[in-house]
């Protein structure tokens, strides 16, 4: 069977080594003659897995001791509601820096729970570019400042941290979590849906500073209350054990490759190769300014809808799957998360060259 590369924005490609291990252990996990999906989440073996997964994640990201790690459900959309329910306190208001669809959606949901100010930081001229990031002069009036450092639809990534003074910085890292080095101590809370870089859909990571826990409004549902979830080790209800197990395997896999430093180098190399090709030809166009081009989601177009549709169809037939751009933007999108090997990017570029030669 010929090799297939999955460029889906999510659920996304998983590391082949992780899938192979999961396949090998599927019917007999930890010599129990049963699947990890069938064991008690409160049993000794799964509790050990949960504990080790947290230790491995702490090692990967150098997470300080005064941060709690939660493995929750409901996706990033669930956190759009959970964050204001837990973090809106005395000031009763938050600032949302919007740069695309997902940050704007988060702001819209947060308005159900408090006073939300929104500032659009995306400049839309000939190229998409992030504008002002210094909000230190106004941030103190807010309980927290929220932003999304990588917008999957447009392929816009923010590499510099917003300046927010002493305010709490909250980041939706669903699409670039574990893709590059970050200083966790600069954030009050980080959250991410798993289905791009962490594991399969169905589990959500929250990394939250301890002093931000314990302030949820009284009407906060139990499953969204960080204090209750933290005290219950993310097991106030039965967690998605198989998804958690796969995340644990991904963490081990990333450590075996050399950790975040090595992963970042690989991601830089993959993205640079693809962007260099896009720069070399007028046949395709990327709409994002160089300084904000995403390493995870590379968008491009021929500026011809019929030609774009033909590209996607022929690419799929060639084993390059899920390259259709989001309906909001159109064109094509290659999502090249951690699990995408350099071989996949090279195969895509080879196809793009062939398609250009046949259709220019």
UniProtKB/Swiss-Prot annotation:
Residue positions binding L-glutamate: 42
Protein name: Phosphoserine aminotransferase
Quaternary structure note: Homodimer.
Pathway annotation: Amino-acid biosynthesis; L-serine biosynthesis; L-serine from 3-phospho-D-glycerate: step 2/3; Cofactor biosynthesis; pyridoxine 5'-phosphate biosynthesis; pyridoxine 5'-phosphate from D-erythrose 4-phosphate: step 3/5
Binding site for pyridoxal 5'-phosphate: 76-77, 102, 152, 172, 195, 237-238
Assigned protein family: Belongs to the class-V pyridoxal-phosphate-dependent aminotransferase family. SerC subfamily.
Role: Catalyzes the reversible conversion of 3-phosphohydroxypyruvate to phosphoserine and of 3-hydroxy-2-oxo-4-phosphonooxybutanoate to phosphohydroxythreonine.
InterPro entries: Aminotrans_V_dom, Aminotrans_V_PyrdxlP_BS, Pser_aminoTfrase, PyrdxlP-dep_Trfase, PyrdxlP-dep_Trfase_major, PyrdxlP-dep_Trfase_small
Compartments in which it is found: Cytoplasm
PROSITE patterns xref list: AA_TRANSFER_CLASS_5
Superkingdom assignment: Bacteria
